[in-house]
Amino acid sequence: MSIKVFCIGDLMLDVVAQIPTSPHELHLGNDTRTIISTHGGGAGGNVASWLAVLGNEVTMVGRIGDDSAGSAITAEFDSLGVRHKNLVIPGARSGVVVVLVDPTGERTMFPDNGANSGLHIGDLPNLDGFNAVYLSGYSPLDPSSLPGVKEMISVIRNAGIPIYFDPASVGAMKEVDLQEIKSWLQLFDCLLLNEEEAIYLTGESDLEKALDALLLDCTMVVIKRGSLGAIGKYRHGQSISVPAIAAEVVDTTG
């Protein structure tokens, strides 16, 4: 069964360098041979793309520049069937992130937000028929996008559409007051986050306690655990753990 969903969030061109060693062992100030590739990326763009691959009707809400990076991103969306409209900001440059991927598949990222800043209520599509909304945390964590994103959330909630929120990385969250971020959580129906983010938001290293703390604000919480799978829980329900599918890790960028 497919759903109709739109994703709000960051759109990036990923420049991925597969390095032969861990980042702290690189030859700084010298050369290190790598394998480099480029892909569409950004948390919002990644989720939109994979939802489309799974056969859902997906619309992307975000911003890119009128440059070659932006053209590459929209071309990838077109090939996957992701709907997009009015993404291009004239005169702006698209967001780009340089990603170092070590032999274990772990990533280290250097993002340049570019055109992603400045989302506003006018970027929101007509809400008729949508079943769900995915919101990347990178958007409200951007000060120039926060007012517009809050307006979007208000309109979406009034329309009765559930919002699934992924708060982004701890590094990004540390640039915003923690209490400010916590105040947003009550606005969402479901919280999707990893272990590090759950611990940061709650101060609880015990995942059951972290789930219960987060469920004071959200109806449902899912904590992603990498190679250990995921654990989720509804408010007043029992937690459910799902193991990860065995696979060779190549790149955890998304």
Which residues are covered by each model-predicted region?
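Glycine-rich phosphate/adenosyl-contacting loop at the front of the ribokinase-like
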Residues: M1-V61, S68-A72, S79, P243, ...
